């Protein structure tokens, strides 16, 4: 889906034109580092992105729709989850699966620490994109999905 959006915004040469930002490179570096050294911590990144995109991402989709006003069906595929019919039920089941994983206290604490770091990396990307407005939106949606 992301490649369709990039193709819409940048055209057929999107791979040459769309270069990752410093924040994106930092995030990718961390994901690769975790994958190599502590792969179970990838769960924290998956949780942060997937739950975030399913929850606050839908809010951001509406904001992007209004701000960018792309033609219907263009430029916002990133926020579509066609295989998930009921996002609330899916999130509940996903959290139940995570709660059922057999991690010791040290691993649980490491996952929480990594999820918080993943959140900060996401905020760094938002800062690059939109400055303080992006950071505020990200905080609102993070607090919404975590119940804080």
Language-model segments: which ranges?
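Metal- and O2-centered redox machinery and metal/ROS homeostasis
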Residues: 1-148
């Amino acid at each position: 889906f992301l490649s369709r959006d990039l193709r819409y915004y940048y055209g057929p040469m999107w791979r040459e034109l769309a270069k990752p930002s410093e924040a994106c490179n930092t995030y990718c570096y961390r994901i690769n580092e975790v994958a190599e050294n502590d792969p179970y911590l990838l769960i924290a990144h998956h949780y942060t992105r997937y739950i975030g995109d399913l929850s606050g991402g839908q809010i951001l989709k509406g904001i992007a729709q209004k701000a960018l006003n792309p033609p219907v069906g263009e430029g916002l595929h990133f926020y579509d989850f066609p295989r998930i019919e009921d996002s609330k039920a899916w999130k509940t089941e996903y959290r139940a699966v995570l709660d059922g994983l057999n991690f010791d206290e040290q691993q649980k604490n490491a996952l929480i620490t990594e999820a918080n770091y993943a959140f900060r990396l996401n905020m760094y990307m938002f800062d690059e994109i939109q400055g303080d407005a992006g950071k505020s939106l990200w905080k609102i949606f993070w607090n919404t999905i975590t119940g804080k």
